[in-house]
């Protein structure tokens, strides 16, 4: 399954961000 890159909208499926977290509906990096 594909995962989302930083900056990708994740409001619908917040658990699919690649090595990033969902914040304010967008994937962001931990750095």
UniProtKB/Swiss-Prot annotation:
GO cellular component: extracellular region
MF terms in GO: sodium channel inhibitor activity; toxin activity
4-hydroxyproline sites (modified residues): 6, 14
Tissue-level expression: Expressed by the venom duct.
Principal location: secreted
InterPro entries reported in the protein's UniProt record: Conotoxin_d-typ_CS
TM segment ranges: none
Subcellular location: Secreted
Keyword vocabulary terms for this entry: Disulfide bond, Hydroxylation, Ion channel impairing toxin, Knottin, Neurotoxin, Secreted, Toxin, Voltage-gated sodium channel impairing toxin
Disulphide linkage map: 3-18, 10-22, 17-27
Function: Delta-conotoxins bind to site 6 of voltage-gated sodium channels (Nav) and inhibit the inactivation process. Potent paralytic toxin in vertebrate and invertebrate systems. Its binding appears to be voltage-dependent.
Domain note: The presence of a 'disulfide through disulfide knot' structurally defines this protein as a knottin.
Entry similarity comment: Belongs to the conotoxin O1 superfamily.
Full protein name: Delta-conotoxin NgVIA
Native species: Conus nigropunctatus
């Amino acid at each position: 399954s594909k995962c989302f890159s930083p900056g990708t909208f994740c409001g619908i499926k917040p658990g699919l961000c690649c090595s990033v977290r969902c914040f304010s509906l967008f994937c962001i990096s931990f750095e």
